[in-house]
């Protein structure tokens, strides 16, 4: 399934990619992730979700987060448009879950994430995301 247009615009703007067909990890990647919202960014797995609701909310699979917890680090990016949203590192995600701010819905195995989310994790442009979370420096206004 192709990525949502806004998700695609965001990942292109920040330089996230999927493994190329024929690469050693491509087949494993496609088996694990049926939707096109899983990427690589600066050597880290990155999950990008978008909410289309007036009051934004997202669902993120416990199974996927458990899988990613075996990695050194990863990003979870929650978008409200192609330009703005919130980003969370592995430790940020763990804090949100352990504090019960993100609650697991047992019926479907998804963490339910509702706004408001921490201002410290917010970004208002792909350039600001890159500067804030990747340490990249851009000339563009943020």
Q: Where do the model's predicted regions map?
A:
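Catalytic cores of nucleic-acid endonucleases
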Residues: 50-91
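Structural alpha-beta junctions
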Residues: 12-21, 70-75, 98-102
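Non-catalytic C-terminal interaction segments of nucleic acid-processing enzymes
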Residues: 2-5, 91-142
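Acidic-basic catalytic patches of nuclease active cores, encompassing PD-(D/E)XK
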Residues: 1-43
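Compositionally biased amphipathic helical and low-complexity segments enriched in hydrophobic
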Residues: 41-42, 79-81, 105, 135
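Generic detector of well-ordered alpha-helical segments enriched in charged/polar residues
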Residues: 4-15, 65, 69, 94, ...
């Amino acid at each position: 399934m192709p990525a949502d247009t806004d998700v695609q615009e965001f990942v292109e703007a920040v330089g996230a990619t999927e493994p190329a067909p024929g690469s050693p990890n491509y087949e494993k990647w496609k088996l694990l992730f049926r939707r096109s919202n899983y990427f690589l960014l600066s050597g880290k797995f990155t999950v990008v979700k978008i909410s289309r609701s007036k009051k934004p909310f997202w669902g993120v699979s416990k199974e996927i987060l458990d899988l990613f917890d075996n990695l050194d680090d990863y990003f979870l990016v929650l978008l409200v448009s192609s330009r703005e949203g919130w980003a969370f590192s592995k430790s940020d995600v763990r804090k949100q879950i352990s504090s019960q701010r993100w609650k697991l819905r047992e019926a479907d195995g998804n963490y339910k994430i509702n706004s408001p989310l921490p201002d410290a994790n917010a970004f208002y442009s792909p350039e600001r995301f890159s500067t804030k979370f990747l340490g990249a420096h851009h000339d563009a206004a943020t």
